[in-house]
């Protein structure tokens, strides 16, 4: 029986671009069928960091932004602001290309599962305060994602690998279970195409809308 990689028809693009701001530093890259032509990073998560990294990416390259014919956008999880800025950047590329660019979207948890050779059953990442994303399922595939309370996620999936985030969690994670999120560990388009889906517009990953508790305070009467 053929494996999953051999049964999927690989798109043939001349100059694909990967835009991934799910972690710090942000990463942009030009993937090849197996591996990467080039990857650039930038510690600044704001729009200027994305432009700076992309500009460096295309230095001394035969093509430029106008030659891009595919974009792989990481929808998260990550900083909501950073993901929205990256989405705006990708939308600008799509608008200027006038239909010439194919858009694909992937989840960082799925791509992270391609970054290790270990046999894993789950990967976790920070969500909002007190909650965590948990991805389960096969590697090199689009897995199932759930949002669990932090204590439940850590108790039910004690062997998870973990992506780090800006917030600290209640317990210390063993160093051996921390997974470095690095595009260099991904086998280019071979892995990207297994975890990506086509999209019309980039949309940041947001499984739960933010909720705000109704204020029930009392305004003191004026004297």
Where do the language-model regions lie?
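Recognition helices and adjacent regulatory flanks at domain boundaries
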Residues: 30-31, 37, 41, 63-66, ...
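A short glycine/serine-rich beta->alpha loop
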Residues: 37-44, 74-80, 175
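Phosphate/pyrophosphate-binding loops at sites that engage ATP/ADP/AMP, CoA/4′-phosphopantetheine
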Residues: 54-70, 157-158
């Amino acid at each position: 029986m053929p494996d999953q990689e051999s049964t999927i028809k690989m798109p043939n693009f001349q100059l694909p671009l990967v835009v991934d701001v799910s972690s710090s530093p942000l990463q942009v890259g030009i993937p090849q069928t197996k591996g990467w032509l080039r990857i650039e990073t930038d510690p600044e998560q704001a729009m200027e960091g994305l432009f700076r990294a992309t500009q460096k990416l295309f230095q001394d390259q035969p093509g430029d932004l106008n030659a891009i014919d595919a974009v792989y956008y990481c929808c998260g999880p990550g900083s909501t602001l950073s993901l929205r800025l990256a989405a705006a950047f990708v939308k600008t590329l799509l608008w200027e290309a006038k239909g010439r660019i194919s858009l694909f979207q992937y989840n960082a948890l799925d791509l992270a599962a391609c970054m290790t050779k270990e046999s894993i059953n789950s990967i976790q990442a920070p969500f909002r305060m007190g909650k965590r994303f948990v991805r389960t399922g096969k590697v090199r595939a689009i897995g199932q994602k759930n949002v669990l309370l932090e204590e439940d996620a850590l108790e039910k999936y004690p062997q998870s690998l973990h992506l780090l985030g800006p917030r600290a969690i209640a317990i210390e994670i063993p160093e051996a279970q921390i997974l470095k999120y690095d595009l260099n560990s991904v086998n280019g388009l071979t892995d990207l195409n297994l975890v990506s889906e086509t999209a019309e517009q980039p949309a940041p990953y947001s499984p739960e809308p933010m909720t705000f508790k109704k204020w029930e305070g009392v305004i003191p009467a004026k004297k």
